[in-house]
């Protein structure tokens, strides 16, 4: 049915193109001017940064930031399935080593230390950038791998505006996006809403099970892998984002960003589950509010910015199972509440060839975590979890100096306080220089120290938390080259290559104990090193045809170089679990008038599921390649701009796993209709 609908849509697009030919408004083909490195911002001296194009963020309404980063960056996205937990990791580190900020406020869970990128709609993000390795120290501490910086921007509306997108996809998936805007000389207002829902019952071949084939005498004459449906995978996600900006016109801007999440997701059954879906109820619910108030005060040679924010998260996880008597029994009933108060002040001062910056950030976490099905006894007190507070302070000073247009030097000092424990001073040094103006060839180098304090679950989770854990500590070194050539309006070509070397001591790992549960320990010294490559090409093939190609590649060996914990420990010298040694992405976009064809490809090499790098069937996940393609047509009508879009995901119906025993969908389709009324035209 979906394939038939796809063919009908393609025919309809062609007919509509003929009908609308007389009103066809051609897209502007703009090849960007090559950046002159002498004009680069002083704040970016020596920084290894990847900026995600705004067009990529608005590719389609069904995408999360996990989907965007998987196809447009060199970092590893670990997904537990469609619309389930998705985390990102830089350079062979873990997801908890990736710091994530939204409009300046950290949104990593203080309990787990990581961020679920499947819960961040890409349509809610206007600016996204990745700070690799040492560069994350400019933003925050704790990013031993790097940092992801997400933010929103004023809509730049003139009067009232509206945008609506309706998406329909395979597995009865529905995605809806609505944005209302208003703007004048001083005010910019925006309201965005995204709602996504699906039974998510896709088919897959289960290679963890075998069905026997019998003859008439019940002798086994063969076997096959059964085709099953994804069970217990439905979801309903609602996101609301309200933004208000006021610009005085005299150098002051005030802002309010408020984001509400209401999510109800089933957690899919494993490929090794033999029970019926009706025998399980495995569900996670989340209500989250994030709000940020900001004030920016701008003058010709200095800037002052302050922010205040609040996060409230209520999360429930329920697991019920029928043991065989027809009555559901509760196995897990977990509840957690997180309240975070945030404050930040930043200052910048320009003095001739110098830029001085200072920043102070505070996050006060108040966390309550309970499993109401587990009761432990501490003396006469019943304990079902933990209830604790922690203050996190981070302050930094930096001096950036550009003695000439060709050379820049930056020094950063950062200090952090978690609870009542100070980190040692965290220094970072950045240097860059233009080697050749012909080709705009630039060299960059940086070195930094970094620390990451244990999460609240690491310290207090019951059972198993370890309050005696030490912070993870490390040093990271970066060296890179970049170039940019081109001719404005004709073509532009840019690329970069960087080498990184990172050492992390006291790596925290959860290990089994003789008491029957897991507990975290400082056990590893990890050496992560490798290469990151990026390239981008834009070509105007004709006045109405443009081709854009982007690619990334990373080689990231990440080895355990600690001492064996026992004679049976086979992890020393081995690649860390769920860290691919090779990743690559390619995206290509061909634009002709109001038609656009987008192709996306990504690749993850083999990943081990065990620290021993066991070569058994369950010890490793095979290499996989993913191919997606999208065709879009735009229309300009007297009353509105319209867009029709068809996306095919997993184009070649690849069988793959991102996490052991978590089924992933085969080929699937999505269709989108976008409407933007012309109220003031």
Predicted features along the sequence, with ranges:
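Periplasmic-side early beta-strands and strand-to-turn transitions of outer-membrane beta-barrels
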Residues: 182-283
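Conserved C-terminal beta-signal and adjacent last beta-strands/turns
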Residues: 8-10, 21, 192, 245-250, ...
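Short, acidic, small-residue-rich periplasmic hinge/interaction motif at the N-terminus
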Residues: 22-58, 95
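Gram-negative outer-membrane beta-barrel transporters
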Residues: 401-408, 498-503, 522-610
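N-terminal periplasmic accessory domains that precede
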Residues: 33, 65-68, 86-89, 101, ...
């Amino acid at each position: 049915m979906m394939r038939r609908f796809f063919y009908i849509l393609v025919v309809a697009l062609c007919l509509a193109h003929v009908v609308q030919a007389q009103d066809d408004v051609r897209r502007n083909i703009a090849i960007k001017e090559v950046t002159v490195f002498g004009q680069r911002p002083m704040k970016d001296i020596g920084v290894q940064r990847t900026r995600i194009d705004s067009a990529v963020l608005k590719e389609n309404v069904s995408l999360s930031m996990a989907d965007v980063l998987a196809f447009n960056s060199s970092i590893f996205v670990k997904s537990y399935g469609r619309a389930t937990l998705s985390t990102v990791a830089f350079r062979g580190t873990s997801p908890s080593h990736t710091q994530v900020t939204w409009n300046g406020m950290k949104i990593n869970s203080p309990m787990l230390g990581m961020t679920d990128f499947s819960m961040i709609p890409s349509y809610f993000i206007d600016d996204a950038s990745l700070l690799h390795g040492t560069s994350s120290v400019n933003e925050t501490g704790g990013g031993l791998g790097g940092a992801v910086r997400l933010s929103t921007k004023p809509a730049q509306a003139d009067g009232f505006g509206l945008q609506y997108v309706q998406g329909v996809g395979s597995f009865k998936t529905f995605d809806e996006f609505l944005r209302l805007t208003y703007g004048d000389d001083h005010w910019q207002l925006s309201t965005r809403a995204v709602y996504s829902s699906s039974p998510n019952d896709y088919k897959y071949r289960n290679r963890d099970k075998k069905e026997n084939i019998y003859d008439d005498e019940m002798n086994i004459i063969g076997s096959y892998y059964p085709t099953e449906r994804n069970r217990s995978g439905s979801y309903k996600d609602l996101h609301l984002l309200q933004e208000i900006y006021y610009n005085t016109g005299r150098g002051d801007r005030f802002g309010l960003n408020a984001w509400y999440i209401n999510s109800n997701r089933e957690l899919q059954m494993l490929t090794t589950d033999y029970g019926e879906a009706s025998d399980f109820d495995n569900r996670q619910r989340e209500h989250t509010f994030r709000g940020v108030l900001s004030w920016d005060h701008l003058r010709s040679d200095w800037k002052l910015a302050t922010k205040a924010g609040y996060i409230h998260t209520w999360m429930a996880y329920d697991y019920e199972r029928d043991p065989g008597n027809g009555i559901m029994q509760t196995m897990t009933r977990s509840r957690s509440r997180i309240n975070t108060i945030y404050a930040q002040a930043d200052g910048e001062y320009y003095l001739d060839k110098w830029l001085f910056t200072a920043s102070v950030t505070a996050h006060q976490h108040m966390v309550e975590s309970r499993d109401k099905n587990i009761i432990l006894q501490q003396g006469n007190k019943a304990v079902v979890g933990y209830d604790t507070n922690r203050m996190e302070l981070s302050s930094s000073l930096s001096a950036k100096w550009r003695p000439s247009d060709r050379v820049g030097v930056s020094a950063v000092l950062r200090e952090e306080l978690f609870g009542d424990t100070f980190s040692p001073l965290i220094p970072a040094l950045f240097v860059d220089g233009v080697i050749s103006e012909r080709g705009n060839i630039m060299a960059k180098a940086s070195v930094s120290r970094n620390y990451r304090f244990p999460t609240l679950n690491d310290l207090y989770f019951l059972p198993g938390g370890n309050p005696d854990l030490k912070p993870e500590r490390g040093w990271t070194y970066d060296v890179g080259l970049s170039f940019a050539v081109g001719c404005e309006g004709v073509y532009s070509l840019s690329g970069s290559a960087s080498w990184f070397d990172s050492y992390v001591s006291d790596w925290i790992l959860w290990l089994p104990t003789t008491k029957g549960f897991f507990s975290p320990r400082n056990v590893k010294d990890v050496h992560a090193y490798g290469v990151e490559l990026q390239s981008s090409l834009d070509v105007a093939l004709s006045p109405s045809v443009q081709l854009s190609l982007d690619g990334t590649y990373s080689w990231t060996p990440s080895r355990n170089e600690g001492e064996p914990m026992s004679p049976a420990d086979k992890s020393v010298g081995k690649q860390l679990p769920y860290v691919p040694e090779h990743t690559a992405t390619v995206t290509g976009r061909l634009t002709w008038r109001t038609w656009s064809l987008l192709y996306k490809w990504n690749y993850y090499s083999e990943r081990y599921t065990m620290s021993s790098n066991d070569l058994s069937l369950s010890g490793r996940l095979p290499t996989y390649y993913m191919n997606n393609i999208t065709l879009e047509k735009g229309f300009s009508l007297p009353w509105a701009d319209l867009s029709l879009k068809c996306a095919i995901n997993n184009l070649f119906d690849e069988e793959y796993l991102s996490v052991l025993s978590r089924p992933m969908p085969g080929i699937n389709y999505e269709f989108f209709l976008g409407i933007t009324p012309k109220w003031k035209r």
